[in-house]
């Protein structure tokens, strides 16, 4: 099983070398040849990764979502893509459609757990979170720094046992 933290760090090292925050997952996706589009989606859908044989994958984001939600959804779909590349399933057809709600974060689906953890580590790398925490930066300021919601930041702080 792939380690989402290591995979996110590899992507950051290779494609986001300037270490500026917030990390822009759309720019990273484009540098990997992925198209990212926004469109009207059903309310229960937050995003999707769609791959047809012989065609580059497309990440679809819900056009009405808040910018921070779109960033996390994009990073999440990128996580699905990275897991496919690493498992050498690059040209097969596949589709991930991510639904909102409690069932999306229960931790029962390994692919979803990987994509969520990858997204969190891409947008909020552990070392930067710890650095800001040591400096006693307020949570809302940290969330702005990373371009995520305060809720996502608190989830990350809790995962690092900093809350």
Where are the regions a protein language model picked out?
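Active-site hotspot residues in diverse enzymes, especially metal/ion-binding acidic/histidine motifs
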Residues: 1-163
